[in-house]
């Protein structure tokens, strides 16, 4: 019964991976693809929680969503600061961040 939801979650996960592979030059699209991967993984945890009738996957999902929100906000803040300094957020211009 839950296999349809699992197929949707796996397709979302693959869509996120495909977004990272195809858009290597755009940071915002890569960040959105990483968020999609994390949300698909948490959706899989929730489906597994419904199948096995345990709560540990739900707790883990809340932790994954918290880390995803923190990662997204920090990543966007770094991108905004970088855009203010350089005027672009293309990956080709990120070589000055090496330290």
UniProtKB/Swiss-Prot annotation:
It is found in: Mitochondrion membrane. It is a multi-pass membrane protein. GO terms for cellular component: mitochondrial membrane; NADH dehydrogenase complex. Coiled coil: none annotated. Its EC number is 7.1.1.2. GO terms for biological process: ATP synthesis coupled electron transport. One of its GO terms (molecular function) is NADH dehydrogenase (ubiquinone) activity. It catalyses: a ubiquinone + NADH + 5 H(+)(in) = a ubiquinol + NAD(+) + 4 H(+)(out). It comes from the Eukaryota. The chain crosses the membrane at residues 2-22, 27-47, 59-79. Keywords: Electron transport, Membrane, Mitochondrion, NAD, Respiratory chain, Translocase, Transmembrane, Transmembrane helix, Transport, Ubiquinone. Core subunit of the mitochondrial membrane respiratory chain NADH dehydrogenase (Complex I) that is believed to belong to the minimal assembly required for catalysis. Complex I functions in the transfer of electrons from NADH to the respiratory chain. The immediate electron acceptor for the enzyme is believed to be ubiquinone. PANTHER family: NADH-UBIQUINONE OXIDOREDUCTASE CHAIN 4L, NADH-UBIQUINONE OXIDOREDUCTASE SUBUNIT ND4L. Belongs to the complex I subunit 4L family. NCBIfam families: PRK05715.1-2, PRK05715.1-5. This is NADH-ubiquinone oxidoreductase chain 4L.
